[in-house]
């Protein structure tokens, strides 16, 4: 049984949950989940957790994402995308210079209102379910960050660009906000998620077309996941204690990367096995001071233990 992360490709049409179901069916395991919804009309990278890999999905939801999007100026739909009912069509008498200026004005932080039709929850219910029942919930705006925008291409009313965003940013809302700034509204007509953190569309796998063996072979093992997090190595004899829930004291550590208090670190044994994720109680720079004064204090607090054998 493999545990880890699969970089899946979601084609246009299926839901993110459909991708999860396909992996469950082909790998014959129930423990499968995804790390961030991708709209049915969109395609691209969908991070899938398999078995104990489902327990680290929260760390993928916090990563930057890159999208390619095409929007149509002057078209307004109830969902902010091409699948929704058309609410209004307007003339959009603006120059290319004005379009570019409006697009680039969103680089940086801004308060974004989530679309009424989205997978976001309100009192335990998905917004899109409430909207279909005629219950439109106006959520408060959320501060999001647009890190950069590039590859802007303008062909009449259709405008495409690439954008790198913070987690929780709705590209549909960004398109509509750009459209409103231009005075004509806009709707996303094509959307591709090109990357999630370090994982790109080039390495993604279409699970609907892949055989079970290929899917299994493409699972990234836990030991190679979350490589952006600091790493510590404990002495081999500490393995059993940590797997049984013992907190990590200084004497257990053999070596470590630099980390700050409050950071999550990956805990390995000398065999290279990932034992746990833990939260740092101290800055790593202070550990040598503790060692010098022979103070065997707790330095890491367990967050998740991975007993995969």
UniProtKB/Swiss-Prot annotation:
Native source species: Thermotoga maritima (strain ATCC 43589 / DSM 3109 / JCM 10099 / NBRC 100826 / MSB8)
InterPro entries: PsdUridine_synth_cat_dom_sf, PsdUridine_synth_N, PUA, PUA-like_sf, PUA_sf, tRNA_psdUridine_synth_TruB, TruB_C
Record field: catalytic activity: uridine(55) in tRNA = pseudouridine(55) in tRNA
GO BP annotation list: mRNA pseudouridine synthesis; tRNA modification; tRNA pseudouridine synthesis
Organism domain of life: Bacteria
PUA domain ranges (all copies): 229-306
SUPFAM superfamilies: Pseudouridine synthase, PUA domain-like
Keywords linked to the UniProt accession: Isomerase, tRNA processing
Enzyme class: isomerase
Protein name, as recorded: tRNA pseudouridine synthase B
């Amino acid at each position: 049984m493999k545990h880890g992360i699969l970089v899946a490709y979601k084609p246009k049409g299926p839901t993110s949950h459909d991708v999860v179901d396909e992996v469950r069916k082909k790998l014959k395991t129930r423990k499968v989940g995804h790390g961030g919804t991708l709209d049915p009309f969109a395609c691209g990278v969908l991070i899938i957790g398999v078995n104990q890999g489902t327990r680290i999905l929260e760390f993928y939801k916090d990563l930057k994402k890159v999208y390619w999007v095409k929007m149509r100026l002057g078209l307004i739909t109830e969902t902010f995308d091409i699948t929704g009912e058309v609410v209004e069509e307007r003339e959009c008498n603006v120059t290319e210079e004005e379009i570019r200026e409006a697009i680039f004005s969103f680089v940086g932080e801004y308060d974004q209102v989530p679309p009424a039709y989205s997978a976001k929850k309100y009192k335990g219910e998905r917004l899109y379910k409430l909207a279909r029942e005629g219950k439109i919930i106006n959520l408060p705006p959320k501060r999001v960050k647009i890190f950069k925008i590039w590859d802007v291409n303008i062909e009449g009313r259709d405008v495409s660009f690439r954008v790198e965003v913070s987690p929780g940013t709705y590209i549909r809302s960004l398109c509509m906000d750009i459209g409103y700034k231009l005075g004509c509204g806009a709707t996303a007509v094509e959307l591709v998620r090109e990357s999630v953190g370090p994982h790109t569309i080039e390495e993604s796998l279409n699970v609907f077309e892949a055989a079970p063996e290929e899917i299994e072979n493409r699972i990234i093992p836990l030991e190679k996941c979350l490589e952006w997090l600091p790493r510590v190595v404990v002495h081999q004899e500490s393995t059993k204690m940590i797997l049984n829930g013992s907190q990590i004291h200084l004497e257990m550590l053999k070596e470590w990367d630099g980390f700050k208090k409050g950071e999550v670190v990956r805990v390995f044994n000398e065999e290279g096995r990932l034992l746990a994720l833990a939260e740092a109680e101290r800055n790593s720079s202070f550990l040598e001071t503790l060692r010098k004064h022979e103070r065997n204090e707790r330095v890491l607090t367990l967050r998740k233990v991975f007993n995969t054998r």
